Amino acid sequence: MTYIVGLTGGIGSGKTTIANLFTDLGVPLVDADVVAREVVAKDSPLLSKIVEHFGAQILTEQGELNRAALRERVFNHDEDKLWLNNLLHPAIRERMKQKLAEQTAPYTLFVVPLLIENKLTALCDRILVVDVSPQTQLARSAQRDNNNFEQIQRIMNSQVSQQERLKWADDVINNDAELAQNLPHLQQKVLELHQFYLQQAENKNA
């Protein structure tokens, strides 16, 4: 059975950058965001239920889910957010567990932004946190997504605090620095962790 390394971090922490460095080394990954998009793909049963609940205005002209419109809707309505989570989370969890079970590599990177919040830590053998300051989170997220600060702050408030996330960490990569200057350091850190995780996987399956 594949050894599972859970990769998590708050909004704007650079999880994708770190995940890509692992995939450059040939490590397979199961990405919660990808799975979340798959379960609400065009013409899927779950998307039909979402449209039934929220109306067709949460669809794009192509009939796909308009994630920004849906995010705006649920962030302002706690009951709608609860309904949506109750619909999606079980389906996403099952799909992720299925994908993890299919992996045959020594270890698999399990990329989940809300790993701790959604109580998915039990699926992991080890947890790697990409850590940045709240100030970096705000600046990066605003620059990347064109989101306003208020919406980013709401997203940050819905996630566990930096301190709480670090309590769960077995390993930490600090990603506060600008990527251009920090890339060699990140590559070295990821390579070291890669060797370590291969050893851990070997020990587990011995």
Curated annotation (Swiss-Prot):
Binding site for ATP: 12-17
Top-level enzyme category: transferase
Gene Ontology process terms (BP): coenzyme A biosynthetic process
EC number: 2.7.1.24
Database matches in Pfam families: CoaE
Keywords: ATP-binding, Coenzyme A biosynthesis, Cytoplasm, Kinase, Nucleotide-binding, Transferase
Family matches, as InterPro entries: Depp_CoAkinase, P-loop_NTPase
GO cellular component: cytoplasm
Sequence intervals crossing the membrane: none
GO MF term list: ATP binding; dephospho-CoA kinase activity
Domain annotation DPCK: ranges: 4-204
UniProt key word Cell inner membrane: no
Reaction catalyzed: 3'-dephospho-CoA + ATP = ADP + CoA + H(+)
Known pathway: Cofactor biosynthesis; coenzyme A biosynthesis; CoA from (R)-pantothenate: step 5/5
Compartments (UniProt record): Cytoplasm
Protein's job: Catalyzes the phosphorylation of the 3'-hydroxyl group of dephosphocoenzyme A to form coenzyme A.
Family per similarity comment: Belongs to the CoaE family.
Protein name per the record: Dephospho-CoA kinase
Higher taxonomy: Bacteria, Pseudomonadati, Pseudomonadota, Gammaproteobacteria, Pasteurellales
Gene: coaE
